[in-house]
Amino acid sequence: MTQIPYIDEALNATVGCSGRDCKCRPTCWAKGDHDKRHKAYLAGKKMPLQYAKPFHEVQFFPERLERALHWKKPRRIGISFTGDLFDEQVPLKWIDDIMAVIAECQQHQFFILTKQVKRMAGMLREYHIHNNTFLGVSICDQEDADTKIPDLLRIPGKHWISIEPMLSPVNLRDYLPIETIGGVEMEPWPFWIVIGAESGPKRRPCPHEWMIAPVEQCQAAQVPVWVKAVSIDGKVVHDINLFPKELQVRQTP
């Protein structure tokens, strides 16, 4: 099981991230959790082996991939959500092992998310991207959108975009099939968009208006959108029933 609500399972075969091009670094939940456990490990407490090393040293645990081979019921599986699968430290052999499991488990859907979309494009050039694979990019603002989404859409396969944490307004119209609101119709376009406010004690504000705009654009384009978390009265809220009506949307591809 996983605490990430839009997937059923997380296979964290890689752990860690170098932090390059990481606007979310101050509040990264994966880094914060790992840092606390790494500190406990160094203090002599009994902890899983992955916490022996700091978060900026990317590690590989290929044995974790075997779980997917034993699940018969179809599941939505996130790959390496406790790091960046296409971090500069990750060798092609690790990618090869992961893609082999994905190819063997056609009953599942696999969701890959990276900030290093150019490296993902280069490393996946020689692979056949199966229909059960969703390749995603993590963005935080319009600069990210305009520099990373075009590179994502050039990779063969299905695509998704995570705007989390959302740190400023993001206009998706140029990347969605919405001629009626000025977008450029293009194919392939994203199959799915996830949007979420920043969490953690150092979180930055995310007004509802920022989130409403891309939600409405996705709805106009009939692209599924999932609103994960909203800032309400200074608190991060995950209960969809407490969201503003315009943001009570949780769709899957």
How would you name each of these model-derived features?
Residues 1-76, 84:
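N-terminal [4Fe-4S]-dependent radical SAM core
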Residues 9, 13, 152, 234, ...:
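Short linear motifs in intrinsically disordered/low-complexity regions
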Residues 59-230:
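Conserved AdoMet/S-adenosylmethionine-binding subsite of the radical SAM
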Residues 231-253:
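C-terminal accessory extensions appended to soluble enzyme cores
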